[in-house]
Amino acid sequence: MAASFDLIVIGAGHAGCEAAAAAANMGSKVLLITMNLQTIAQMSCNPAMGGIAKGQIIREIDALGGYSGMVSDASAIQFRMLNRSKGPAMWSPRTQNDRMLFAATWRKMLEQTKNIDFWQDTVRKLCIDTETRSISGVETGMGLTFKAKAVILTNGTFLNGQIHVGEKQIQGGRSGESASYGITEQLIEWGFESGRMKTGTPPRIDGRSINYSKTEIQHGDECPETFSYDTRHSPFLKSSEPKSQKPCFITYTNPQVHEILKTGFDRSPMFQGRIQGLGPRYCPSIEDKITRFSERERHQLFIEPEGWDTVEIYLNGFSSSLPENVQLKALQKIPGLEQAKMFHQLFIEPEGWDTVLRMMTNNGLNLSAEQVALAKSYLVQAYPEKPKAPAVLIDGPVKITMQAWSD
C-alpha cells in the first residue's frame, strides 16, 4: 500500500465514511484508518436513521452524492414520515434499521469506491511540516507513518473516551472497545480548547422476554418512501418480493419506575458531579426526564427491533448511567417488561473532545475540495492555528474565518 495520500480520515463511523467517500469521488486518494475494520459504520446507539431535523440532513447528503440515504434505505426494516401534521418542509423521514446490515452495506459501498484504501490501526500522533506549518501526515500506534496533504478527524467518542455505569468508570470509546490516546494531548499542546460532551445508550433487551400484549403496536407507513432519490435500494419498494416492515412497540414508565430509579440517584455520576460534559439537547436520559419533568407520571418508551434476524431490542427513551441493579429493577416494573432480560446494560459515554473549538486567533483557514468535515468531524489543516469545521463541504478553494458556535 502507498504511504502517501491526498487525505487521511481517522475514524470510520458515519461521518468518517461520508468524508472518505466524498473526497474519493472527487478524485482524491484517501486512506481511511479505523481501530477495527469489522466495526466500520457501526450503529453504536439506536438502530435508526433520520428523524426530526436529522432526516432532512440525510436527504441533503444524498442530494450532494453521499451514501447515507442509500445505505439507510437498503438496511431499513421500517419507514415512518414524522411531523406529517405540519407543513411538508417539516416532514422528517426516519427508518428503523437492521444494525448489522447497515454496517455491512456501508462497508460494501466503500470497498466499491475507487481511491479509498483501508488501514486497521490507531493514530497516536499528527505529523507537522514545520517549514510550511501544515499537517503532513499521521503516525500510527504500530509505529507506521502515512503522509497526507490533509487529515480529517472523525473520532466520535474514542478520543480519551470514558464510560460511566453507576459508580464505575471504564476507559473506552464504546462498550468493549478501547479509547484512543495521543491526539487530544497533542491538540491541547497546540492551544486547542478541550472539553467533554456525553452521550448515553439504553439497555438492550431479549425480545423473547417481552410481553407485547401489554404494549401498543406501531406500524410503519403504509406507503413507505425513501431517503435517497435512487429508490432501487429500498426493500419495501422492490418490484420482486418486496419485504413487509417490522413493527415497533410503545410502552410507558410509571410512578413506581420513577421511585426505583430515584433510589440510584446518589450513585449516578450525573448527579454526583463525575460527569461534567454537556448532553444532547433533545435526547435526555431517563433520570434527567424524571428530574426536569417531575410533574409527569409517565414517559413514553419505544421498543425497537435491532434487525430482521435478531431478538435483540433497543429500548428508546431509557438511556441512563444508573447502577445495573437499579436499571433492571426499574425495567421490570414497566408494562410488558416484567420478565425482561438484559443483553447488556445502559451507560453514559462522554466524548474526549467537545464539538466546539473556539478560534484563538483571527487568522483565516484555507479549505479545499478534499477537506470535508461532517457532523462530529474535525478538520486539522493548519498549525499552530486552531481550526474546527463542524459541518463543511466546500467545492474549491476558499478562505474563511471560524468562530465559536452559539445557541
Give the role of each language-model region.
Residues A2-A15:
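Beta1/beta-strand and adjacent pyrophosphate-binding region of the FAD-binding site
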Residues A3-F5, G141-A150:
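Core beta-strand elements of the Rossmann-like FAD/NAD(P) dinucleotide-binding domain
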Residues A21-C127, M142, T154-Q171, S178, ...:
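Conserved N-terminal/central alpha/beta ligand/cofactor-binding core
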Residues C127-T145:
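Conserved beta-strand-loop-beta-strand element in the redox core of flavoprotein oxidoreductases
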Residues G200-T215, S285, T291-R298, T310:
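Terminal amphipathic helices with adjacent charged low-complexity linkers/tails
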Residues E222-I275, E297-E338:
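Conserved FAD/dinucleotide-binding core of flavoprotein oxidoreductases
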Residues Q339-L365:
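Gly/Gly-Pro-rich "capping" loops immediately C-terminal to redox-active cysteine motifs
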Residues G364-D407:
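Flexible coil segments in periplasmic/lumen-exposed cytochrome c-class electron-transfer proteins
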